[in-house]
Design a protein with these regions (language model features):
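N-terminal alpha-helical targeting/anchoring segments
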Residues: 1-162, 180
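TRNA-recognition modules of translation machinery and tRNA-sensing kinases, especially anticodon-binding
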Residues: 70, 157-471
């Protein structure tokens, strides 16, 4: 039964010792004891999060952990016996006691064979244990709402009152009329859910990137330009399943490594800290990265695919932090404040939501979403999110820290906590700015776009067409 569950878990997690020759990360260090001692909570938590694991998987981890401890104890006993019989061999040789030496050597051979058997059995159980445990999602913050997306709790609202929904404010129609958006050429060149930003829309993207960067840097985040490609094992360690059909990541063909186009700059930013040990006094570490996000599933959700709202590639500014275990909850509130500051400066209505269990994915302990009002869509739309992943990613990426070093007594290492949040998802922000900022004359004819003056210092060139109004 354990082996069958492990095979199923390996198919979900895509972890196998056969990957070892090309791997850059050691095997994940998961807390099996915590899982085994909290089977009821872990099972309920997985159900609340709609985790794609077998109903008996967590109980199976507890059973496998018991088996692991039993074999480990037997193996340690045999290793102690090997040491003792080795001492007897040396003593009998010194005393020229040939019969005693021969008996001890025969016993040593038996012990050697038993150790080899136990080591093989332990390795098999450990692989089963790891494969099962990797499929278990993170714990959940006690304040997180239970249920689907509709159960999200509004924590705060910001900006002006939402203007009435109307199709005249559709961002695609506005973009086409003002020469800002070319979906037809993109469909010819690449396909559906790709786009060209032209004229002032291209300048708007650059202004938004630099504006978000400036706010993050002002709050102590170090700027980073990230790779857009990562190894699959790094992607998996961050909590994503790049070979899972639901994720539909883009994979690079014709390479000797299993490389993936990143769905978020969170992945290369997290990878920066892999296999490193930090001093606790040097934490938190805060970086802000600019990268391109690639999402192969863009065409999967009906009306969300309209225009710029859900696309295959977009520019994204990402916040990432590594903290001690005690710092992460405060860091989440600090990062929320930064995100709120960025969105408040853009002048459209938005709200902050505490996301429910079914929206947390595998890695998040708690997640906030920020949604902007988009009157052309007639709905609120996510423009930012923030997740505290506690030690979920750190245990897989081996991000650790230690306390003060004592002479002759090196302090033990502890797995760090990681947090990630969107500073700016550019196409979604452009949707919100166009749909809220469009201006019309008395006959409801489009006359231009009102943009927040906070972007003006980051604007390259002049508004040659004269339809931008800075407010």
């Amino acid at each position: 039964m354990l082996r069958a569950l492990a095979r199923s878990a390996r198919r979900q997690c895509r972890f196998s010792s056969s990957d070892a020759p090309n791997r850059v990360l050691p095997a994940p260090r998961l807390d099996y004891r915590h899982i085994a001692e909290n089977v009821v909570y872990k099972t309920t938590n997985a159900q609340n999060r709609k985790a794609p694991i077998d109903h008996d998987a967590i109980q199976s981890v507890a059973r496998a952990y018991t088996e692991f401890k039993t074999i480990s104890s037997a193996l340690n006993s045999q290793r102690n016996a090997r040491s003792a019989v080795g001492e007897r061999i040396r003593h009998s040789a010194k005393e020229n006691d040939a019969p005693a030496k021969e008996a001890a050597m025969a016993e040593a051979l038996t012990i050697k064979e038993e150790i080899a058997r136990l080591e093989a059995e332990l390795a098999s159980v450990e692989e089963t244990l790891l494969s099962l445990a990797l499929a278990i999602p993170n714990d959940t913050h006690p304040s997180s709402p239970l249920g689907p997306e509709s159960a999200a709790v509004e924590l705060s609202s910001h900006g002006p009152n939402p203007i009435p929904a109307t199709p005249t404010r559709d961002h695609v129609a506005i973009g086409r009329q003002l020469g800002l958006l070319d979906l037809e050429s993109a469909a010819t060149v690449t396909g559906n859910s790709w786009y060209y930003l032209t004229n002032e829309a291209a300048l708007l993207e650059m202004a938004l990137v630099n504006y978000a960067l400036s706010v993050a840097i002002r709050h102590g985040f170090i700027p980073v330009m990230t790779p857009d490609v990562a190894r699959s094992e790094i992607v998996r360690a961050c909590g994503f399943q790049p070979r899972d059909h639901a994720d539909q990541a883009y994979h690079l063909a014709g390479t000797s490594q299993d490389l993936v186009l990143c769905g978020t700059a969170e992945i290369p930013l997290a990878g920066m800290f892999a296999n490193k040990i930090y001093q606790d006094t040097g934490l938190p570490l805060k970086v802000v990265g600019v990268g391109h996000a690639f999402r192969a599933e863009a065409g999967a959700r009906g009306k969300d695919t309209h225009g710029l709202y859900r696309v295959h590639q977009f520019t994204k500014v990402e916040l990432f932090a590594v903290t001690t275990q005690e710092q992460s909850e405060k860091m989440m509130e600090d990062m929320t404040s930064i995100q709120t500051s960025i969105l408040s400066g853009l002048g459209f209505p938005f709200r902050v939501l505490d996301m429910p269990t079914e929206e947390l994915g595998a890695s998040a302990y708690r997640k906030y979403d920020m949604e902007a009002w988009m009157p052309g869509r007639g709905a609120w739309g996510e423009v930012s999110s923030l997740s505290n992943c506690t030690d979920f990613q750190a245990r897989r990426l081996h991000i650790r820290y230690r306390g003060a070093v004592q002479p002759d007594h090196p302090s033990p290492t502890t797995f760090a906590h990681t947090l990630n949040g969107t500073a700016a998802a550019i196409p979604r922000l452009i949707v919100a700015l166009l749909e809220n900022g469009a201006t019309f004359d008395d006959e409801e004819k489009l006359t231009g776009i009102a943009l927040p003056s906070i972007l003006r210092p980051f604007w390259v060139g002049a508004d040659t067409k004269g339809y931008i109004q800075w407010q």
